[in-house]
Amino acid sequence: MIVCIAEKPSVARDIADVLGAKTKKDGYIEGNGYQVTWTFGHLCTLKEPHEYTPSWKAWSLSSLPMIPPRFGIKLISDPGIEKQFRIIEGLMQNADEIINCGDAGQEGELIQRWVMQKAGAHCPVKRLWISSLTEEAIREGFSKLKDQKEFQPLYEAGLSRAIGDWVLGMNATRLYTLKYGQNRQILSIGRVQTPTLALIVKRQQEIENFTPQQYWVLATLYRETTFSAIIRKSDEELAQEESDAKENPKKAKKAEGNRGIPPITDLATGQALMERIKNVPFTVTEVAKKQGTEAPPRLFDLTSLQVECNKKFAYSADETLKLIQSLYEKKVTTYPRVDTTFLSDDIYPKCSNILAGLTPYTVFTAPLAGQKLIKSKKVFDNSKVTDHHAIIPTGQSPVNLTEMEKRVFDLVARRFIAVFYPDCKFATTTVIGEADSIEFKATGKQILDPGWRVIFAKPQTNLPEGMTDPDAEARESDEEHSLPAFVKGESGPHLPKLDEKWTQPPRPYTEATLLRAMETAGKLVDNDELRDALKENGIGRPSTRAAIIETLFKRHYIRKERKNLIATPTGIELVGLIREELLKSAELTGIWEKKLREIEKKSYDATTFLNELKQMVSEIVHSVLSDNTNRRVTTIEETATKTATTATVKQPKKKAGTSRKNASSATPAPTIPSDNELVGKSCPLCGKGTIIKGKTAYGCSEWKNGCTYRKPF
């Protein structure tokens, strides 16, 4: 008998249908020589500290660092999990072959490997590796099963990540809680969570410390066209351009003379310039026309989809992940937890059928039918695809979708259709003029051939039912603005003006901009190619970033004001307490992330990684224990009191349907509970669930989602 193990019951049912297994049993489906069973996500987890050494049960500075000589796994304590595991164990003990049908990624590999290890599986194991759950994809996957040994590096990377997070999280959280916490409040520290919080705190401090500088902009109106004075670049701007050119030569700006007037920093200078030119004719000195092309926007990876949904619909990263996961399980989009925007060459022959299946978008797909589809290197590139390709539709018609799912599917579908359309062709016109040797510039843009832009063009009279127009706002900012026909040498009267301006502080992070910052380890990058290069050193993985942001909300380290993410006093104080750069540096944490990726690629040793992490934790413990100051972090209760006091000055009216993030500030922060007050309290480990009472121990209501909190009676 061949045993197939999937990550959830719904996927198991899809696989069983394809394999012809029809007989439903307790915990599995049988038939045609197969037994298809399932997990509920994580069934196993790493052991708790006290399960290695009993003295580690109590939180004590003297027991730190806690580093077991050998890590072990255990079954999560829950009757439902225990029952399902016994079923899996029985099936595997009698199996001739096992097919690992877990989620095709690092976490999915770890989940199933732990279950097989715990069950004592000893027969050959194959791996099903698919990017969608359609019948066609499952059949193709079973025709190309791989040996599980090929995925050993993937497992080692996942195991290293889990152990690394355990070592750092368990030790640093206890260390900072006991050293700097008050009133039993837990100060949660994490390998990804803390640097992410530090990014938000740093941005907030930059805003608070920002001093606005007044300046003036000189412009003039000539033939109903506004020309702005050309401002000479500062040495800092020139140095930044040079640095950017070295990092990304393809996008280097063409070298030009540093022309123009110095920035106008006082009113008198500006008024003098106005007086100087107001009675002098304006003369056109240069008219330059240039044609260019604009490629379609890239296909989505998970992060870019989360960014787009946050910008357009204000969906949180977590909401978007759940929506695209649901679309994947409904078989209308491909595997979502990906970090590439490219497709492999083997997808190209399938694209015509996928387009044909997008029946709500016939108005856009009909012009492509029967034609040879464009195959751009910006879309199809095997070297940019590893485990999975970009998120695309499967070709199955999107039916029975919620309104939120329709919006997300619409984004994915339009991006996919657009990559097979021609580039947008446009012409830009740059006009330079001068008055008394002061140069002014105006630019215009004209769309010659919209190409792929018709997919997003307005008015959207052919929107699929229930679909919105996701790019209306973006299109308005991209609207073409033509200039009148200017001729070099022409001259005439003009009307100068002087506008007062102030320099602006950095903007607070939103979930969209924070996701981008996590992706590039804190570097502000707008260019796709440079962003790709920095992804290797990003903070966290695409599939975990949403959970990290949610954790910061649950820990009361950040809150949301409209779309802006604001650090709470507790979050600010915690980051201020941490002197160890390895704990809060986005760049250094990105290097750790890169090493985990290299383990997956077999170019870095997992043992070396863990030894380095253990050494780092030991150094952090020594450093914190050597701190002789009496610093403490303000408790949530104190923070709430202070906020309430200051908030009485001016309270804006709350709108109906206030964001859950704002409402969540009323929930208690995690604390170190005593045994007699555990049940119903917030889980001290994940902060999401509440403590429940089992047969032999207390646990967390979020155990199905991976929380491993357990406290024996």
Task: List the model feature ranges, each with a label.
Residues M1-W166, M170, I261-I264, Q271, ...:
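Intrinsically disordered, low-complexity regulatory segments
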Residues K179-S188, I200-T265, K312:
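C-terminal helical "lid" subdomain and adjoining coupling/linker elements of P-loop NTPases
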Residues M1, I99-A104, N183-I186, K289-R298, ...:
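Conserved short loop/turn motifs at secondary-structure junctions
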Residues E247-R298, Q306:
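Metal- or metallocofactor-binding catalytic centers and their adjacent structured scaffolds
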Residues F71-I98, L199-I200, E308-C309, L411-I417, ...:
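Phosphate-interacting basic helix/loop segments used at nucleotide- and nucleic-acid interfaces
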Residues I2-V3, I81, K118, T173, ...:
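Basic, low-complexity terminal or inter-domain segments flanking catalytic cores
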Residues G80, I87, Q93, E135-Y222, ...:
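C-terminal or mid-to-C-terminal helical accessory/interaction module adjacent to the motor/catalytic core
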